[in-house]
């Protein structure tokens, strides 16, 4: 299992429309092979980030291979759709997180 993390900063004026689009985008991604789940977070506003909303999406995939397949076969088209609709209205960064260790409370 890996986590594909997508960090989005969207202009406040377009945040509602972006979130609506993002919900559809995530549902579409979750139909692709290897995608297991997605969690969406809204970061609390920081002093230097008052004109943008920061959204973090953590996709869980069954393998690195599934992510590579998505990036090669689906990502270019899906990313182009976001650019067409929201050009200049958001910034995005992505990273891949591989499991290292899981520590669980002893009483669980």
PLM regions with names:
Residues 23-27, 57-60, 76-80, 89:
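Short, low-complexity, polar/charged sequence segments that are solvent-exposed and flexible
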Residues 2-9, 41-73:
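Short, well-ordered beta-strand segments in beta-rich or mixed alpha/beta enzyme
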Residues 14-40, 79:
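Short amphipathic alpha-helical segments
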Residues 4, 18-21, 35, 59, ...:
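Aromatic side chains
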Residues 13, 65, 77:
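Short alpha-helical
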Residues 31-32, 62-65, 102, 106:
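A short, structured loop/turn motif at beta-sheet edges
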Residues 39-51, 80-108:
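Glycine-rich beta-strand-turn "strand-cap" elements at beta-sheet edges
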